[in-house]
A protein has these predicted regions:
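A short, well-structured juxtamembrane/interface segment
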Residues: 20-37
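Glycine-rich phosphate-binding loops that contact phosphosugars or nucleotide phosphates
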Residues: 42-168
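Alpha-helical scaffold segments in soluble metabolic enzymes
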Residues: 11, 18, 30, 165, ...
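Hydrophobic packing residues in well-ordered alpha-helices of helical domains and bundles
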Residues: 5, 9, 28-31, 53
């Protein structure tokens, strides 16, 4: 690795850590409690955010929770007592909002992971986890990268990558909190991992 690439890696790690440090602890705990208290959890996201949501669904399954990915054929219907967790980093996405509306009408609660807590989708949600990171909507494509999106600087990472990397870290932190809430162990989680690989 060149010195320039190593410097970019350090900058990216600082940015991701900065996002995690700015999480609202109370909102994080409410989000964890909502997940642990749900009868069934359905998860949805688009693009690379969708990949993070699939990884999170897998970890929730490892915790023994009834977690499913929206769009998969094995997804049961949602209703009262269930939770739809959606990712909408840039804010209002029409397809995500439509799914949230369907879930709400069926009696399920809606939880939103976003960088835009003031969006209509977030305002209508039962739970919001604000990840304060650059998304595609914030990326101005500048070449002079900075580490603080609050000052209008562009992340060293392209497009929405800062949000996506921070999202994965936040989800793993939620898994650790949920492990405490559910009384699961590393061993019990490993025991639920597939043997077909």
């Amino acid at each position: 690795m060149t010195a320039a690439t190593a410097d970019l890696a350090r900058q990216a790690l600082v940015e991701i850590g900065s996002v995690a440090e700015r999480l609202n602890a109370a909102a994080f705990e409410r989000f964890a409690q909502a997940i642990s208290g749900a009868k069934r959890i359905a998860l949805h996201g688009l693009g690379r955010e969708g990949l993070q949501m699939k990884g999170f669904a897998m970890r929730l399954f490892h915790l023994g929770l009834d977690a499913h990915v929206v769009g998969e054929m094995t997804l049961p219907p949602v209703g009262a007592g269930d939770l739809l967790v959606v990712s909408a980093g840039p804010g209002d996405l029409a397809t995500v909002a439509a799914l949230a509306d369907i879930a709400r009408k069926a009696g399920a609660k809606v939880a939103v992971v976003t960088a835009q807590p003031g969006s209509a989708l977030a305002r209508a949600a039962d739970h919001v986890l604000h990840i304060p990171a650059q998304t595609m909507a914030d990326d101005q494509g500048a070449d002079d990268c900075g580490a603080d999106d609050r000052e209008g600087k562009t992340s060293v990472l392209p497009m929405g990558s800062l949000f996506e990397f921070a999202q994965m870290l936040v989800f793993e932190l939620l898994v650790l909190r949920l492990r405490d809430l559910t009384g699961e162990t590393a061993a019990s989680m490993r025991a639920r991992h597939t043997n077909l690989e």
